[in-house]
Amino acid sequence: MANNFSQLARKSKTNSPIEKVSKEQTGTPSLEIYKLGDDVLRENAKRISKVDNSIRNLAKDMLQSMYAAKGIGLAAPQIGIKKELLVIDVNFEDAAAEPLILINPEITDYGTTLNSYEEGCLSIPGVYLNVVRPSTIKLRFRDEMGRPRKMKADGLLARCIQHEMDHLNGVLFVDRVTSKEDLNKELIKEGFHQKDVIPIK
């Protein structure tokens, strides 16, 4: 996957906005999505020092892979690239809605209300389990043009952002599941192993 990033960096040298990506959920993801048990998912991502076309091209390919895999979020570490980059689209059924591209995201505030909701992950296909998270967050990040942004998110968007940001720190949603019995049952059913889970303490 490191070679893929080098190829992306050579695609263009101009400073242009990201091209619109079709939301059609068909075909094969253009990028390999690593699965639970792959060591790369447990490594910390690094901040992006310069937002240029290599980053925008990477985000574009991540969006294509996310849509093809029928996901609503994807983090760069999931494709083997240790960079603080997320793509998210909780409105994937709305062709006009713009996806979110978050570069170097930081959560600055968590709401006090906690909610339990079922989550899944493109790196652990077929496994769906409840996870408790704050229902609202505030964050800052840079957009695909490198501009600083701030936003408040709630509901599914807040959950998705937190889920994807966990990937930047080598954390997977199964690490946060409190019911070990349900977790083990789901993992075995889909061919995964509980030894690859690192519980959050």
Curated annotation (Swiss-Prot):
The protein's Enzyme Commission number: 3.5.1.88
Top-level enzyme category: hydrolase
Biased composition (Polar residues): 1-17
GO biological process terms held by the UniProt record: co-translational protein modification; translation
Cofactor binding note of this UniProt entry: Binds 1 Fe(2+) ion.
Cofactors (names): Fe(2+)
GO molecular function annotation: metal ion binding; peptide deformylase activity
Binding annotation for Fe cation: C121, H163, H167
Pfam families assigned: Pep_deformylase
Keywords from the named record: Hydrolase, Iron, Metal-binding, Protein biosynthesis
Region of interest (Disordered), residue spans: 1-24
Cited InterPro entries: Peptide_deformylase, Peptide_deformylase_sf
Family note: Belongs to the polypeptide deformylase family.
General function of this protein: Removes the formyl group from the N-terminal Met of newly synthesized proteins. Requires at least a dipeptide for an efficient rate of reaction. N-terminal L-methionine is a prerequisite for activity but the enzyme has broad specificity at other positions.
The name this protein goes by in its record: Peptide deformylase
Organism per entry: Prochlorococcus marinus subsp. pastoris (strain CCMP1986 / NIES-2087 / MED4)
